[in-house]
C-alpha cells in the first residue's frame, strides 16, 4: 500500500516520488511543492482530452482492489476550470471527479448566477458525458474525493466528503473503458491528481495528499 505518498508526505522535498507519471511533458512545468508548503499545487492547462499540455500527476493501478483518496482546494471562476481526481487509461478514456463552477438560471430573479459544482465525468473514446447531475458544493474550503474498485476491479465507486469523515457515494461505474482490451493500448489504468483551465489563465488547485491503499475484497 501507499499511504499519503503525495505532497503531504514530502514537505521538505522539491520533487515528487519517482513512481508518479505525467502526460507528454515533465510535471515540473506545471506543479509546485513550494508555492504552498505541504501541498502539491497544479497549474491548470488543457483538458484531459487534449493531446498536448495536460496538468496531471498520476500513479499506475497495481491492484484489482484499491481505494484512492485525495483532498483538493480549488476556487474556479468559470466552467472552463476544473480540478480533482482522475481514474484514466488515456486521453480518450477516463473518469473525472472534479470541482468546477457552473451557471444557474434563477427563476425568481431571472438572471444567471454561478455556483461551485462537483461533476463526475466519463469519457469513452472521446465521447464525454456526465455520469450524474452536478452537485452543489461550497465555494471555499477543501473537498475530499475517493474512488474504490470492486468486483475484481470490474467496477468502481466514487465518493466525496466535505469534512474527510462522512463520505457520500455518488455512483458505481464499469471500468471496462480503462482496460487494454477496450482501449487497444498497453499503458494500464492510472489514478491521478488533475487540473485544467481552458481560459489560459493557469488557475491552480492545491492537493493536500494523495493516498492509495489496497482495499478489502468485497464478499
Where are these regions (language model features)?
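Extracellular glycan-recognition regions
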Residues: 1-219
